[in-house]
Amino acid sequence: MNPPSASLVAVVVTHNRLAHLRRTLGRLLDSGPDMLTAVLVVDNASSDGTGDWLAEPEDPRLEVVTSPRNLGGAGGFELAMREAVARFDPDWILLMDDDGRPEPGALAVFHAGDRSGWDAWAAAVRHPDGRICDINRPSINPFWNRAAFLRTLRGGGREGFHLGPADYEGTALRAVDGVSFVGLFLSRAAVLRAGYPDGRLFVYGDDVLYTLHLRRLGGRIAFDPALRFEHDFSTIQAHERRFRLLWKSYYHHRNLLIVYRAAAGWLFWPALLAVLPKWLLKIRHHGGERRVFLRLITRAIRDGLAQRLDATHEEILALARTGSEPGPVEEGSKSGPEKG
């Protein structure tokens, strides 16, 4: 069991999704101060009335940091964690998007459990209808785990190194390596060890890179199926292969190369021979925009291999422009194709 005085601060990153944010903050603040010390929201330059709504807090535990520009999810989480540590120095930080929230009672379960011996805890994240949320499934690095490597090599794909239904329905803890920032409980020791996410990533991959970094430094991360979260994430269909906002393809592929290098070590270069042809075949799913998609993915591969993170978001939006006006920037939506 956590010490009775263990402090927990939730951080939420939001951008133009006020309806989701209202539900998430309502759920969080339903927990008393003994369960939740504070909630810190980073408003990523929202233009939908979020700032006005947050300016009238109904709970003194709610604190708001407003960014004058959109930092993306990665920049938002870096800022949120830095501010949470500076303002509260909590025992635990709980991370989530504006559309992710603990199920009722989840924080009580966290405090009631023995959390010693682990630096971070990953929740079991489901859709509101109870289905496992695939994008939030914790993973085991197959390059560090022989059994996971062999399962993946034998055609298991993502199933070879991600937790599955049996892990979610059981009661046993599982040691994991890669975790999303929806329902991740980070201890003070974890932050002292691993520091903060790299905001230059902008969107995609910052969570997996951060948790892999924590593991590489000796931190321990446990998946606890009793810690239940919901992710009201419905903008993607399982069969989808096309980026609806083309600029996201740049960040997805650039950052994935950086994740692969961090996970694979010296095996990164042989693995690349299998990865790159698969990526280039995605061009066929972008009829009418193939030239733009190819331009973005070529730049992504170049920057990812060089581990360059200095491209501005304005540059990437310019690369993604076609003859039509570019769509809105919606970092929080995570709309896009399946991972990989």
Give the positions of each predicted feature.
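Short, well-formed alpha-helical segments that are part of the catalytic scaffolds
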Residues: 17-32
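A conserved acidic beta->alpha catalytic loop
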Residues: 43-52, 69, 100-101
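Glycine-rich, basic loop-to-helix element that forms the pyrophosphate-binding segment
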Residues: 67-87
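Short beta-strand-to-loop acidic/aromatic patch adjacent to the donor-nucleotide binding site
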Residues: 89-99
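Conserved donor NDP-sugar-binding/catalytic core segment of glycosyltransferases
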Residues: 105-141
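Short, flexible, basic/aromatic active-site loop/helix in glycosyltransferases
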Residues: 141-177
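A short, conserved alpha-helix in the catalytic core of glycosyltransferases
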Residues: 178-179, 183-195, 200-227
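Non-catalytic, C-terminal membrane-associated alpha-helical segments of glycosyltransferases
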Residues: 247-248, 252, 265-340
